[in-house]
Amino acid sequence: MKALSKLKAEEGIWMTDVPVPELGHNDLLIKIRKTAICGTDVHIYNWDEWSQKTIPVPMVVGHEYVGEVVGIGQEVKGFKIGDRVSGEGHITCGHCRNCRGGRTHLCRNTIGVGVNRPGCFAEYLVIPAFNAFKIPDNISDDLASIFDPFGNAVHTALSFDLVGEDVLVSGAGPIGIMAAAVAKHVGARNVVITDVNEYRLELARKMGITRAVNVAKENLNDVMAELGMTEGFDVGLEMSGAPPAFRTMLDTMNHGGRIAMLGIPPSDMSIDWTKVIFKGLFIKGIYGREMFETWYKMAALIQSGLDLSPIITHRFSIDDFQKGFDAMCSGQSGKVILSWD
């Protein structure tokens, strides 16, 4: 089968011919329809320091997808041939304390699809049936293919009660924009998103965010005054991994504010901890999606009218995969979809 693989320990990704993965007793064989390029895939493409430490070569990469079930393991129940599915990209052990306690998203032995085991940038993918999620009929293939990053956004945004709250989102990447859209959809009062990339900020404006702020040109305190905010943000969603953005968030949070952090800093990050202490801030780290509560909420949000379509900006055939990676690497894109049909 055709597959996009990290074939060499250098920048790039290559179209390869690899065997169709073998189906285990508890697995599903999925024929891939569409995949989306993640920021993680860009790290792997660029072969940065994290990738060099993490990715075995050769490796079929990718973990954002939608497809249909074409093979079912002997022990699998609840699925049938032809089911349209996406899937949780974190394969958990099932044996650690968190897994046995129902907190599988906190499994300390997590294996990543397309990172530690063969991924979805291929004609076929095998995953445990436990990890598959059936896609409702009224959700398109394009939207289903970005459920993985959408899940990061939903998990982050819905960590706290947002109804009537003022929310600051730092980082207008696709996940940050989707998190801001979720916050607005579920009843936040003001949702402000910050970045220095004007293309991405314009995408956020198309999604109906209260204010998209280029912090290289505007002062966040002025924006808060313009919105009639007198006490600071109630909830912060840190999606950028940029230390200056997090420090600004700490400066502008209200006392008793709550922060969910998904963005990963490039290295050790120093902050003024007295602001955390004296403001009584609550900080929560976010990794992946809750299995599978986040997935059900994702589907329900779209079915209840949340429109994510503006976040998908580029679509290519898999034969034009290089154009897709070029678009992602440029910073002038939202989500990029690759079609395998």
From Swiss-Prot:
SMART domains: PKS_ER. Its cofactor is Zn(2+). The record marks 148 as: Important for catalytic activity for the proton relay mechanism but does not participate directly in the coordination of zinc atom. Zn(2+) 2 binds at residues 93, 96, 99, 107. InterPro entries: ADH-like_C, ADH-like_N, ADH_Zn_CS, GroES-like_sf, L-Threonine_3-DHase, NAD(P)-bd_dom_sf, PKS_ER, Zn_alcohol_dh. Its EC number is 1.1.1.103. The keyword Metal-binding applies. NAD(+) binds at residues 175, 195, 200, 262-264, 286-287. It is an enzyme of class 1 (oxidoreductase). Keywords: Cytoplasm, Metal-binding, NAD, Oxidoreductase, Zinc. It is found in: Cytoplasm. The active site is at residues 40, 43. One of its GO terms (molecular function) is zinc ion binding. Pathway: Amino-acid degradation; L-threonine degradation via oxydo-reductase pathway; glycine from L-threonine: step 1/2. GO terms for biological process: L-threonine catabolic process to glycine. Zn(2+) 1 binds at residues 38, 63-64. GO terms for cellular component: cytoplasm. Binds 2 Zn(2+) ions per subunit. It catalyses: L-threonine + NAD(+) = (2S)-2-amino-3-oxobutanoate + NADH + H(+). Catalyzes the NAD(+)-dependent oxidation of L-threonine to 2-amino-3-ketobutyrate. Belongs to the zinc-containing alcohol dehydrogenase family. PANTHER family: L-THREONINE 3-DEHYDROGENASE. Homotetramer. This is L-threonine 3-dehydrogenase. The lineage of its organism: Bacteria, Pseudomonadati, Pseudomonadota, Gammaproteobacteria, Enterobacterales. The gene is tdh.
